């Protein structure tokens, strides 16, 4: 049985429990607290307080999310879209992607290597299949084209 979130102390405790498990964005944390029965009038001041204390940080959340999703084999376009769906500001997302130290070409090459065992497409059908896969994963079309045509060979 879950506790009723009708006091600032209960909301703060629940928010800190959630933040102890992993970083959360403000919008995501608000949604989770609402689902547990907290009201917006009580949520906002507590989240403001957590942010002032440095316990709730959008920048840390962005960095953590980008590191996790890129490590799972997703590219910048897919990550950008997922963060946008989570209610984060487009400018903050773009800045976090620029500041991330992810080598997207290397990441795309690793994903392609795992999926297709390094076999470049021999016909239009297999090229389309590999292109769709990498595009779905969120890698830019120009990078995909260079990889599949072999123009990036000297980099790997």
From Swiss-Prot:
Pfam family of the protein (one): RecX_HTH1
Keyword line: Cytoplasm
Protein origin, superkingdom: Bacteria
Claim: Cytoplasm is one of the keywords in the record: yes
Record keyword Cytoplasm present: yes
Gene3D superfamilies with a match to the protein in the record: Winged helix-like DNA-binding domain superfamily/Winged helix DNA-binding domain
Gene Ontology CC terms, in alphabetical order: cytoplasm
InterPro entries cross-referenced by the UniProt entry: RecX_HTH_1st (IPR053926), RecX_HTH_2nd (IPR053924), RecX_HTH_3rd (IPR053925), Regulatory_RecX (IPR003783), WH-like_DNA-bd_sf (IPR036388)
Biological process, per Gene Ontology: regulation of DNA repair
NCBIfam families reported in the protein's UniProt record: PRK00117.2-1
Family statement drawn from the similarity comment of this UniProt entry: Belongs to the RecX family.
Function: Modulates RecA activity.
Entry protein name: Regulatory protein RecX
Taxonomic placement: Bacteria, Pseudomonadati, Pseudomonadota, Gammaproteobacteria, Pseudomonadales
Gene that this polypeptide is encoded by: recX
């Amino acid at each position: 049985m879950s506790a009723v979130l009708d006091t600032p102390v209960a909301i703060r405790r629940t928010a800190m429990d959630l933040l102890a498990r992993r970083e959360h964005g403000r919008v995501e944390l608000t949604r989770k607290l609402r689902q547990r029965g907290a009201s917006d009038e009580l949520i906002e001041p507590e989240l403001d307080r957590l942010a002032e204390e440095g316990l709730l940080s959008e920048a840390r959340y962005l960095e953590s999310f980008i590191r996790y999703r890129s490590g799972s084999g997703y590219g910048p376009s897919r990550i950008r879209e997922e963060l946008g769906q989570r209610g984060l500001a487009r400018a903050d997302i773009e800045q976090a992607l620029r500041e991330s130290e992810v080598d997207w070409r290397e990441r795309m090459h690793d994903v392609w290597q795992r999926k297709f065992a390094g076999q470049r497409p021999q016909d239009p059908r297999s090229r389309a299949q590999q292109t769709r896969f990498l595009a779905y994963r969120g890698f830019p079309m120009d990078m995909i084209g260079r990889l599949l045509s072999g123009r990036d060979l000297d980099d790997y």
